[in-house]
Amino acid sequence: MTSAPLAARLSIPSGPLFFPVTAYRPDGALNLDVYREHVRRGVEAGAAAVFACCGTGEFHALAPEEFERCVGAAVEETAGRVPVVAGAGYGTALAVRFARLAQDAGADGLLAMPPYLVVAGQEGLLRHYRELAAATSLETIVYQRDNAVFTPEAVVELARTDGIIGFKDGLGDLDLMQRVVSAVRTEVPGDFLYFNGLPTAELTGLAYRGIGITLYSSAVFCFAPEIALAFHKALNSGDDATVNRLLDGFYRPFVDLRAQGRGYAVSLVKAGVRLRGLDVGEVRPPLHEPTEDHVKQLAQLVDRGYALLQEGM
């Protein structure tokens, strides 16, 4: 756990937000040694924070005891250099259980993912996230996606809730997000944080930057940190020529490849980590592995991305 509050640590985008994959052995059991190495490499490469056991880390596939062990390993490997945020989800009771496990493991905060299965109204969603935020002392980021979509008025209420420090958007509705940002700025002045949480968030980085959202999750950082870091630096320094070169030559083709299979937002990333020499194992069901041809295309694309970096030097 870091000494400074999570909101303060995240408010300055010093690097990409790292969402490590969870490593498994051939028999499907956790491989904490490889997971530790994966986390350590990411921190040493320049990650601003580690988001452990979230979407890319297959939160949905982890038993509570596995979750606690992974979060604890991430905390130990970061050793306070960057904050560790852990996923928490499912129904309210289970989400609270995972939140308390994360706190016991030493995490700095929570990424609160959508409730499982149900489609709730705004009042029910607010009740869920308020109870989750009150269950621990961890600062909480609410993740908007799928069945958890909020009105601007509801996000204002989230921003007024003790313990909730930010809002991550995985929906991609920029009109809605502009209204959210404006409403919170008007009703709850302060330092409420916003995150671009779309898969391969770099693709929409310019658009989100236009409404003042510069924090984002980077799956590419898992397997091509130099590319992710170059993009992050360019985006935050206004070097749009480099941003567009990487978008056109690497990120857009990567998104096109990711769209070739369901669950590729996780399994293709995991394949990328294996391509770079770290055997993190396969994804757990119900996700499936990318095809051999798609892995070959990924390898070629990664080579192209690194070539683009050389061209820009």
From Swiss-Prot:
Pfam families: DHDPS. Its EC number is 4.2.1.41. GO terms for molecular function: 4-hydroxy-tetrahydrodipicolinate synthase activity; 5-dehydro-4-deoxyglucarate dehydratase activity. InterPro entries: Aldolase_TIM, DapA-like, Dehydro-deoxyglucarate_dehyd. It catalyses: 5-dehydro-4-deoxy-D-glucarate + H(+) = 2,5-dioxopentanoate + CO2 + H2O. SUPFAM superfamilies: Aldolase. Keywords: Lyase. It is an enzyme of class 4 (lyase). GO terms for biological process: D-glucarate catabolic process. Belongs to the DapA family. PANTHER family: 5-DEHYDRO-4-DEOXYGLUCARATE DEHYDRATASE 2-RELATED, DIHYDRODIPICOLINATE SYNTHASE. This is Probable 5-dehydro-4-deoxyglucarate dehydratase 1. The lineage of its organism: Bacteria, Bacillati, Actinomycetota, Actinomycetes, Kitasatosporales.
